[in-house]
A protein has these predicted regions:
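Residues within mature, well-folded domains
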Residues: 1-79
């Protein structure tokens, strides 16, 4: 079972920025998935940023974004 929004917020804390919203009907596509809300975590001390993509209340995935644009999926603990 995928974690819900509350669990992700508990694990990762509050995002630095947010793009879109749970109720936004517009979608975008990144990392091979269509999403309508992105949580952005600026983490210069770790050498990467983190993005969490949602489609409404469904978690689509978490990615590390490195300088230069390289990305890699990141695993979260199971709910």
């Amino acid at each position: 079972m995928k974690p819900d929004r509350g669990q992700v917020a508990k694990w990762l804390g509050a995002p630095t920025d947010q793009v879109g919203s749970v109720n936004d009907p517009r979608t975008a596509e990144d990392h091979g998935v269509k999403w309508n809300e992105m949580w952005v975590y600026k983490l210069p001390e770790l050498g990467f940023d983190r993005v969490v993509l949602w489609n409404r209340y469904d978690l689509l995935g978490v990615w590390r974004v490195f300088p230069g644009g390289r990305t890699e999926p990141e695993k979260l603990p199971e709910a």
